[in-house]
Amino acid sequence: MRLTIIGCSGSYPGPDSPASCYLVEADDSTGRTWRIVLDMGNGALGVLQRYVDPLLIDAVLISHLHADHCVDMTSYYVLRKWHPTGPQPPIPVYGPKGTGRRLAKAYDLPKRPGMREEFAFSTYTGQINLGPYRITPTAVEHPVDAYGLRIEANGKVLGYSGDTAETDALLDIAADADLFLCEAAFRDGVDNPPGVHITGVHAGEYATKARAKKLIVTHVPPWHDSADAVREARSSYEGPIELAATGAVYEV
């Protein structure tokens, strides 16, 4: 399984990165490569095209419906609907309840058909089996309906926190994960609003408790120093830590 960081800027695009978007690739037993995208935040579709033909994406999984995690689905809709090669078959898009309706509204489309001719929308209800992937969505703590994702393929595990406040759900998402991709939007030692995000210290603590083998710190807003988030995580996690950066590739 391979993870490519497409966008990792927290809350809005930064000068060096779009908002949240991650490309995951894995081969099935026949050698076919399956490609899924986790989130499609502001500016992500442009950068995604550096690494893959968007028409080769097999599915998209949206962690929650804040713009920095989903709004470029409106651009992806245009790409699939009006591509010169002709209309594309709908691909699966998984997300919280109301994902299809919200995205149609964002592009000022009528509720029916909305984007249903391009995307086959499904609400998170349980485990998802797709090609070589077994994906387990788990509700996390955020001001809106939000999910973290545990992705298993070929004996490897990738945990993705999505956006979340402190919650033991992260322990299930990251349990014994080969790689834990975890947000750290807040700084330690300041009066952060409750129920929204976590700090680098928290990310490290969850990685430690979950016995994750490697921690990738992501979703740091441009107004914060990302190096601080990594330093915080190092104070609570002794394993390998890296800061997510656009274009970085990890073999999980």
Residues covered by each model-derived region:
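Adenine-nucleotide cofactor-binding loop residues
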Residues: 41, 141, 165
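Metal-dependent catalytic neighborhoods of phosphoester/phosphodiester hydrolases
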Residues: 72-80, 106, 225-233
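Cap/insert and terminal regions of metallo-dependent hydrolase folds
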Residues: 166-250
